[in-house]
């Protein structure tokens, strides 16, 4: 059944106390009837409990039109949480949301996934990786594996007549040193507000039962830049992003010597009618105005996904 194109929807956001879930809840509440579901009590959690509470989940999803499923364990948990717990939360939890959604007659699930699941495929030897929906993931961690498994079960259910699904593989979206975050915004980072807008667009996207999109900041780079990005990133930045080069020079920051991957959101731009609006200049503005989203500069190094 297609989603309504204009009337307000009843939407449940899981993981609504988290960074991304909260941003999505706040954005959607401007035009829809939104309730949040999370283990942590907060202003955006109308239902407080765990996804393994089937009765609570059923009540939360009663008469819902759509579910946005953000609740998950993430990369920082890998060193601290057993693999079995990852599967319990990321795979079994997604299955419980799917089952409750199907029972409630939910028509659309938007699943918040991650570009991290591409694993080693994102960083080939000798070149920056060009990462889009056509690239086959090579998962490395339990986080990668469980997000892929959750995607697969949602996609299979949609293909068999269950709720339609839109899978959004989002890039880095958390506080980092300003010089790192600003550079990443060109090729592997995104603002939480742009993530929220992508979810809003995915709610009403027509088309197949299941579709997957890479969600990342707008990139000035082209696929043909990948070899040079790997070995001579400053020269490519001079050509493709002179405003960032000038801003870094003014602040005395070094440019990255190597860029190892580029996430391309082109399919989402074309299909969803979505446009990321908060690029590197917004990162600098947030830093200059002491917004705690952005940390002080470091030497330019950053942890991997």
Where are these regions (language model features)?
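Catalytic helix-loop patch of NAD(P)-dependent Rossmann-fold dehydrogenases
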Residues: 88, 123-165
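Glycine/proline-rich active-site loop of Rossmann-fold NAD(P)-dependent oxidoreductases
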Residues: 148, 160-163, 175-184, 192, ...
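Mid/C-terminal beta-alpha module of Rossmann-like enzyme folds, strongest
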Residues: 197-260, 265, 270-271, 294-299
């Amino acid at each position: 059944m297609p989603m309504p194109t204009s009337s307000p929807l009843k939407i449940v956001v899981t993981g609504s106390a988290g960074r991304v879930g909260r941003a999505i809840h706040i954005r959607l509440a401007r035009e829809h009837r939104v309730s949040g579901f999370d283990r942590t009590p907060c202003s955006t959690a109308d239902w407080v409990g765990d996804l393994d509470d089937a009765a609570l989940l059923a009540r939360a999803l009663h008469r819902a039109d759509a579910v946005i499923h953000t609740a998950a364990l993430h990369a920082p948990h890998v060193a601290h949480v057993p693999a079995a717990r990852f599967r319990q939360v990321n795979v079994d939890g997604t299955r419980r949301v799917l089952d409750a959604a199907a029972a409630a007659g939910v028509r659309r699930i938007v699943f918040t996934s991650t570009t991290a699941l591409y694993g080693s495929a994102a960083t080939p030897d000798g070149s920056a990786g060009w990462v889009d929906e056509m690239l086959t993931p090579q998962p490395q961690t339990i986080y990668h594996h469980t997000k892929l498994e959750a995607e697969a079960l949602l996609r299979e259910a949609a293909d068999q007549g269950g709720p339609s699904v839109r899978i959004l593989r989002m890039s880095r979206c958390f506080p980092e040193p300003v010089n790192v975050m600003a550079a990443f915004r060109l090729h592997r980072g995104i603002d939480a507000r742009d993530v929220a807008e992508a979810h809003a667009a995915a709610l009403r996207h027509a088309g197949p039962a299941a579709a997957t999109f890479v969600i990342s900041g707008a990139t000035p780079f082209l696929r043909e830049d990948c070899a040079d990005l790997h070995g001579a990133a400053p020269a490519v930045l001079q050509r493709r992003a002179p405003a960032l080069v000038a801003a870094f020079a003014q602040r005395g920051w070094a440019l990255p010597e190597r860029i190892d991957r580029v996430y391309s959101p082109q399919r989402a731009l074309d299909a969803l009618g979505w446009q990321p609006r908060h690029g590197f200049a917004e990162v600098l503005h947030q830093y200059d105005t002491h917004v705690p989203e952005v940390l002080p500069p470091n030497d330019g190094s950053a942890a991997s996904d």
